[in-house]
Amino acid sequence: NFYVPYYLSTIGGEFQSLTGLYPNYSTLTKWKSGENSFPYGLATTFKEKGYNTYAYHAHDGYFQNRYKYLKALGFDNFKACNMGLNINCNMWPESDIEMIKATTNDYINSDKPFMTYYMTVSGHLDYTKESNSIVSKNWDLVKNLDYSDKAKSYLATQIELDRAMESLLKELENKGILEDTVIVLLADHYPYGLSLEEINELSSYQRDELFEINHNALIIYNSSMKNTNVTKVGMPIDVLPTIYNLFDIKYDSRLFAGSDLLSNNEGMVILDNLSWITDKGKYNSLNGKYSGDIDSDYINNIIQNKIIFSRNMITYDGYRYIKEK
């Protein structure tokens, strides 16, 4: 029951998972400047625990100012196209396989634990052979499937990510550290390069264009872990608190809009139009319809407080002042 609400393309999804806050246009603009302080950010927190931190992106590092805001989050070692990443950057989209193979030696022999962040790109639209190098590369693997060309093209791009992950797992296993590695995998948004009809070709059930189009998955993997399915609803703002809990990192839960998915807190998903889903009901802000066993006004008040908190923490650089005190 993990949802990835669409907020202003990739950067909105990335913002949620890296900060534990709700995005909007003004906060994303401020965040991209790289001027905010994030003493409780992902890389900063793990560095304080003795980890080396790395970040990689298989596209231009200047795009969306990614090199600035990842630095603000504590990533000292960042590579991307035009920023030291040695892959073929003269194609679109670039290859996640090439990114993984070009970077694992940076950290896999580290004398310290490492925390590595990858922003993949091979699954990006458009989903046609003519405009997408990854679709063209993997087309023979999907061409005979009983789907539309757009749906097959989408699958072709995901094969690239799948094989990139295979390469990473093999490298970790060959080094003898796979069992001591945790992998967290999530999306930044639904594939908006496909129509709802094309998405439903690939879905095991019929999705609607408001709630279920955003239904996705969060995978937290360790080779020695027992499989567990978490049924409570969640979204990317919950990922950071969940990771901190799993690594026994102490944090003040009041400093994030999200919450630990493994806690007893009720799950909540908030869409960009303020529709929402909880473990006990859902609300459609477009028509005002509510269904479930919980006070909708109570949930709406919680949502407003979380949104205001998120906006203020970025707009006024709130974490900087909290840390100083």
Go through each PLM region and give its residues.
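Solvent-exposed soluble domains appended to multi-pass membrane proteins
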Residues: 1-325
